[in-house]
Amino acid sequence: MKTKRWFVDVTDELSTNDPQIAQAAALLRENEVVAFPTETVYGLGANAKNTDAVKKIYEAKGRPSDNPLIVHIADISQLEDLTGPAPEKAKTLMKRFWPGALTLILPCKPDALSPRVTAGLETVAIRMPDHPLALALIRESGLPIAAPSANLSGKPSPTKAEHVAHDLDGRIAGIVDGGPTGIGVESTVLSCADDIPVLLRPGGITKEQIEAVIGPIHVDKGLSDQNEKPISPGMKYTHYAPTAPLAICEGSPERIQHLIQEYQQGGRRVGVLTTEEKAGVYSADYVKSCGRRAQLETVAAGLYDALRSFDENKVDFIIAESFPDTGVGLAIMNRLMKAAGGRVIR
């Protein structure tokens, strides 16, 4: 398959009349898959109502079939066809954070979507992205768009169109290149099924921001039973991982430097994931800063690009610094723990 690529100059006034967006939307209506930017990461979109289209997402990514997909909409009016009545707290969150990096788990209307989208569950993960290109594409298609991250399953999510092309060129119909994404980590996923909502995946909207609007929420610590069906994307399987094994070190820079030397003595090429403040401290074979520790939003924005760079530099082992698990740091540490497969050095 030849993957078509469009380059779109993104502005807030981006029109659905843009001929490149029209071409991409036409492919979506033909039940093909198209990658496009959102404010979080690039998504791999398909018609959420058509099972054949959704199947192509799973095939292109190599994604397990019990991992549900997030449905993207461009207007609140689309909810009426897809979900049952939303709880009041969900409505409050929509008013405050949509469009934005917040995905809500809501009851799904019977037969409203392909069962491949919900992985057989009675709920659906749904959000409205805060990106002019994404919104224009969804509106032009006239469809709800199922879209996980546009990467091979298990690999770091794409924040640039080049990342998408690296993983999926020849496997999908098209890539809409709208430049790098802003937030850099996926949306926050919140289940509103209970009286007290449950945070299933930390992301671009922080726990603190949500609680400032609706009061206390619970935090899901992750599924302990791997045979359970996940109700949200990103709750199961290793994610976001470069090729080389990665471990998080919660120790001091001196401890990390000692580990570097220890692994190098074994003949391994060692990489370190750090921040601008400490990039000059380590004598590893490859040192990569993903942002400023004093401004964790920059770390989130640069995280996946940094993880991908370790593959390009062919390291054998990666040591990552740890971060505070508050604010957007909770999302950063969630992604690093997934990438590390839970490996932590203290």
Swiss-Prot record:
GO biological process, one term: regulation of translational fidelity
UniProt-listed Enzyme Commission number(s): 2.7.7.87
Keywords: ATP-binding, Cytoplasm, Nucleotide-binding, Nucleotidyltransferase, Transferase, tRNA processing
Residues annotated to bind L-threonine: 40, 72, 127, 147, 187
MF-aspect GO terms: ATP binding; double-stranded RNA binding; L-threonylcarbamoyladenylate synthase; nucleotidyltransferase activity; tRNA binding
Subcellular location: Cytoplasm
Catalytic reactions on record: L-threonine + hydrogencarbonate + ATP = L-threonylcarbamoyladenylate + diphosphate + H2O
Binding sites annotated in the UniProt record for ATP: 63, 67, 123, 149, 157, 201, 240
A cellular component term, taken from the record's GO annotations: cytoplasm
Enzyme class label: transferase
Keyword Hydrolase (UniProt): no
Pfam families with a match to the protein in the record: Sua5_C, Sua5_yciO_yrdC
InterPro entries in UniProt: DHBP_synth_RibB-like_a/b_dom (IPR017945), Sua5-like_dom (IPR006070), Sua5/YwlC_C (IPR038385), Sua5_C (IPR005145), T(6)A37_SUA5 (IPR010923), TC-AMP_synthase_SUA5 (IPR050156)
Domain called YrdC-like: residue spans: 18-205
Family indicated by similarity: Belongs to the SUA5 family.
Function: Required for the formation of a threonylcarbamoyl group on adenosine at position 37 (t(6)A37) in tRNAs that read codons beginning with adenine. Catalyzes the conversion of L-threonine, HCO(3)(-)/CO(2) and ATP to give threonylcarbamoyl-AMP (TC-AMP) as the acyladenylate intermediate, with the release of diphosphate. Is also able to catalyze the reverse reaction in vitro, i.e. the formation of ATP from TC-AMP and PPi.
NCBIfam families: L-threonylcarbamoyladenylate synthase
Miscellaneous field: Complements a S.cerevisiae SUA5 disruption mutant. The four proteins YwlC, TsaD, TsaB and TsaE are necessary and sufficient for tRNA(NNU) t(6)A37 threonylcarbamoyladenosine biosynthesis in vitro in B.subtilis.
Protein's recorded name: Threonylcarbamoyl-AMP synthase
Taxonomic classification: Bacteria, Bacillati, Bacillota, Bacilli, Bacillales
Gene this protein is translated from: ywlC
